[in-house]
Amino acid sequence: MVQIGIRGSLATADMWQFSYKSGMRVISIEEFHDKGWRWAAEEARKITGDGSAYLSFDIDSLDPAYAPGTGTPEPGGLTTLEAQRLIRDLGGLDFVGADLVEVSPPFDTGGITTMTAATILFELLCVLAQARVQRKPLSRG
């Protein structure tokens, strides 16, 4: 498992001990911005290898300027373009599913978050479709 874009004023290494002890790769927002979305995608690819993958996208990984309608807005997140490019660069992995979580319509100023969520869902559907086309047909034996 890879967690990308972890941040927050209280996000210290101690807070992520469960993730580390469970073998998860945590890529902080600082590391993401220092090394870039291509590097983060490559890290995820290394960990996933040829295995099946599931992509869960938490809308609050985005900066609240792009997605204010979430329960835990935290400045300093990804831009919409960074998220799109990251997801696109993960194309070719054997995705078996995906989801988008943490959209909170009552907090959504002017429909910004729902429009952004729809854009991210479109990107997720594209990589899911690509994975399905690339997957070998199931044997009916």
Predicted ranges, named:
Residues 1-7:
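Short internal beta-strands
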Residues 1, 15-16:
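Long hydrophobic alpha-helical segments that form multi-pass transmembrane helix bundles
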Residues 10, 16-141:
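Catalytic cores of soluble, metal-dependent hydrolases
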